[in-house]
């Protein structure tokens, strides 16, 4: 599926005059994290990459916190760190610290949106393009199930019940 998306994007870019070279790397190498390999996602020696990361749950903090300056992989930390876009903004780092101290859900959501905008529309460090959908199902005799794209399938298991037939 990933290669199909890449081919489509390459075609779109070609239509507007942008040349693109696709490089296919075995997933075990790309996601392997071998500090000696030039082809890991931590190093990523290219101008743009496609990845399918998203956070699970209603709490954006763990996902956003991956983008602080100190999480940028590089030779000084043996290519460890989750900030593979290497986005670095001290204001964003300060927001991560601030977010960890906020309890009110509405205030957390507001700051989370601000931080998301910093990563996306304000800096283009991350450009959301496609959400790869997931397939979920449940028995017709099970009520109260509320599936969503942002949490595990059993996030509201306490609300489930058997439907009387």
Predicted regions and their residues:
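Bilobed "Venus flytrap"/periplasmic-binding protein-like clamshell domains
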Residues: 1-11, 124
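Solvent-exposed, acidic/flexible segments
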Residues: 2-6, 24-27, 84-92, 101, ...
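Hydrophobic aliphatic residue packing
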Residues: 9, 16-18, 137
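Periplasmic binding protein-like
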Residues: 14-75, 111-112
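Short, solvent-exposed loop/beta-turn-alpha elements that line the ligand-binding surface or hinge
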Residues: 35-44, 65-97, 101, 130-165
């Amino acid at each position: 599926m990933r290669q199909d998306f890449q081919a489509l994007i390459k075609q779109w870019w070609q239509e507007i005059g942008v040349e693109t070279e696709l490089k296919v790397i075995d997933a075990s190498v790309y996601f392997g994290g071998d500090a000696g390999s030039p082809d890991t996602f931590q190093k990523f020696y290219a101008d743009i990459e496609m990845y399918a990361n998203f956070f699970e749950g209603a709490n954006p903090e763990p996902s956003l916190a991956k983008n602080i300056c100190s999480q940028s992989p590089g030779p000084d930390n043996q290519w460890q760190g989750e900030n593979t876009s290497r986005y670095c903004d001290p204001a964003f780092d300060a927001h991560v610290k601030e977010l960890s101290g906020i309890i009110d859900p509405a205030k957390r959501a507001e700051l989370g949106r601000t931080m998301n905008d910093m990563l996306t529309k304000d800096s283009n460090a991350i450009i959301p393009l496609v959400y790869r959908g997931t397939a979920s199902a449940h028995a017709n005799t099970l009520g109260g199930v509320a599936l969503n794209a942002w949490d595990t399938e059993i996030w509201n298991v306490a609300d489930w019940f058997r439907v009387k037939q």
